[in-house]
Amino acid sequence: MIKEELNLWAEGVEFRHLDAYYNFILSVLNFLCIKEYELSVILCNNEYIQKLNGEFRQKPEPTDVLSFNYFEGSEQINHKIQGDIVISLEYLEFSSLEFNVEMYEELQRNTIHGILHLIGYTHDTNDFQNETMLIIQERVLRETRRVF
């Protein structure tokens, strides 16, 4: 039986576009041919993600996105997802200014980034020209429709 379960919520932040964001995530999953998923996405503030980053990565500082993969056999690329993505909207406000992009584009980029990690992609650098995962990320961002 194929499971398709997607949950979204906001923790410590207000986000008024959950329906549009939900549809965006579904379009990314479809584009990446992910048919089986149990995925939760939490939109949060820096305090919330900093706590998780410290606890699970021993980096007590805020970050943009964290992915938690619960699927056994996650060492290789797999088109099934069982995991969580946590994204700090507060952090994205800063990074969108730094990269001179709209905040919602940065949210879409980080959502795709988290999904790619959950299906097994990794990257050693942030080189958008040479890292396979980041090249795929930008392609998915271009190809999926803008929803905000």
Curated annotation (Swiss-Prot):
Matching entries from PANTHER family are given as: ENDORIBONUCLEASE YBEY, CHLOROPLASTIC (PTHR46986:SF1)
Member of which family? Belongs to the endoribonuclease YbeY family.
Keywords, in A-Z order = Cytoplasm, Endonuclease, Hydrolase, Metal-binding, Nuclease, Ribosome biogenesis, rRNA processing, Zinc
GO terms, molecular function: metalloendopeptidase activity; RNA endonuclease activity; zinc ion binding
Check the record and name the NCBIfam families matching this protein: rRNA maturation RNase YbeY
Q: Which GO BP terms apply?
A: rRNA processing
Function in brief: Single strand-specific metallo-endoribonuclease involved in late-stage 70S ribosome quality control and in maturation of the 3' terminus of the 16S rRNA.
UniProt-listed PROSITE patterns: UPF0054 (PS01306)
Q: So which domain of life are we looking at?
A: Bacteria
Q: In which residues is Zn(2+) bound?
A: H113, H117, H123
- Indicate the enzyme's highest-level EC class: hydrolase
Indicate what this protein is called per its UniProt record: Endoribonuclease YbeY
Q: Pfam families, from UniProt?
A: YbeY
This entry's comment on the bound cofactor is: Binds 1 zinc ion.
Report the EC number(s), separated by commas if there are several: 3.1.-.-
Entry's localization field: Cytoplasm
Q: Among the entry's GO cellular component annotations, what is one? A: cytoplasm
InterPro entries attached to this UniProt entry: MetalPrtase_cat_dom_sf_prd, YbeY, YbeY_CS
**Cofactors demanded by this protein:** Zn(2+)
